[in-house]
Regions:
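Short hydrophobic, aromatic-rich alpha-helical segments embedded in or entering the lipid bilayer
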Residues: 84-87, 286-328
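Hydrophobic alpha-helical transmembrane segments of multi-pass membrane transport proteins
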Residues: 150-223
Length: 354
């Protein structure tokens, strides 16, 4: 145990050899989340409306106030203006054309997705007016909320980035420092020392796990501070991350052992981290996309990790179709990664041919 403690202490001292890489690996996902949360789509859209001069215009304003989620915020925030010119924004004006009242919406945007969202909200407001005029013959819509309260998309986005933060820290730092052992010639110490290689690898994996948890905790804290929503179990969320951290650590260390160079190891970790994040339910649950994409996404370890974390942020709602299969999948990936790391370490460090 004392020898393991000395190995672990030596691993942490390696921070001094690459402090910038440590900061990039640990803080990059959190900084990315903070920036993305500022520009991300929100449920409530500002809609500029020319001050109404008719009773229909006043009714339209009232209808706008009714458009929203039954368990969440309004979808439209009306802003009354006097100038019908949209400028670089958008404006709605109730006008008379051929004796008929028309809601004229003028856009100064080039963002087609934002225009689509604003048109949908205007249609919803007009549907409210239409239903009032139709009376008993109006279109009846029954809404059945899936959750007690609406949760903003920034929560899902941040939750899905927690595995990214853990993976990136473990893979990038593991690969970079392992490659440095070859570049600096210190790999000879591992080849000649009497300490068993499982103990050496255990110290490296333990250190990477602590670093990965640090990156994930930082992102988790900013997720809670920005959205005001915290998981129902902090411990459960981070226990779920353990298989992914071990997988990432093994991939990073193996990259360093194979390439013997810091830059390729750095790039392999970066590319694999973002590929796993993008394909592995980074922007939405895999079940919400095409069948082909879902099948590919379920091959990525991030997807079962996110599905297991989901209930702790979304009132206990389960989304994993096959929880047992997902657990077995992660166990299999983890065991394969550990075996692969041992094999590569033996070939690249302990082999007599080296």
């Amino acid at each position: 145990m004392r020898r393991f403690s000395l190995l672990l202490r030596n691993e942490f001292k390696s921070f001094l050899t690459a402090p910038v890489v440590h900061l990039i690996a640990i803080l990059q996902p959190t900084l990315m989340y903070i920036l993305m949360s500022v520009i991300m789509v929100v449920p409530t859209f500002e809609m500029r409306i020319v001050n109404p001069s008719s009773s229909l215009g006043a009714r339209f304003i009232a209808a706008v106030d009714e458009v929203g989620s039954p368990v969440g915020p309004d979808y439209i925030e009306p802003i009354l203006v006097d100038d019908p010119s949209p400028g670089f924004r958008q404006v709605v004006e109730i006008i008379e054309t051929d004796g008929n009242s028309t809601a004229l919406q003028t856009y100064g945007y080039i963002d087609s997705n934002l225009v689509k969202n604003l048109r949908n909200r205007l249609t919803a407001a007009l549907l409210v007016l239409w239903n009032i005029d139709l009376g008993d013959q109006g279109i009846t819509i029954h809404e059945h909320p899936w959750l007690p309260n609406d949760i903003p998309y920034t929560v899902y986005f941040g939750m899905a980035m927690i595995p990214l933060a853990a993976y990136l820290a473990a893979a990038m730092i593991g690969g970079y420092l392992m490659a440095q052992e070859f570049e600096n010639g210190t790999i000879l110490i591992y080849r000649l020392c009497p300490t068993s290689y499982p103990l050496i690898l255990a110290a490296k994996l333990t250190r990477l796990m602590i670093i990965a948890f640090t990156g994930a905790v930082i992102l988790y804290l900013f997720l809670g501070l920005i959205t005001g929503i915290w998981s129902s179990s902090f411990i459960a969320v981070f226990v779920i991350l353990i298989p992914l951290i071990l997988i990432a650590s093994c991939i990073g260390l193996a990259a360093g052992l194979i390439t013997h160079s810091s830059l390729p190891s750095f790039l392999i970790a970066l590319a694999s981290a973002f590929a796993f994040w993008l394909i592995g339910s980074g922007f939405g649950l895999a079940a919400g996309f095409s069948t082909i994409f879902e099948k590919i996404s379920r091959l990525i370890p991030n997807t079962p990790i996110i599905e297991m974390m989901f209930p702790y942020f979304y009132y206990g709602r389960q989304v994993a179709a096959h929880p047992l299969a997902a657990n077995l999948q992660l166990i299999g990936y983890t065991l394969f990664s550990l075996i692969m790391l041992v094999f590569v370490y033996q070939k690249r460090v302990l082999s007599k041919d080296r």
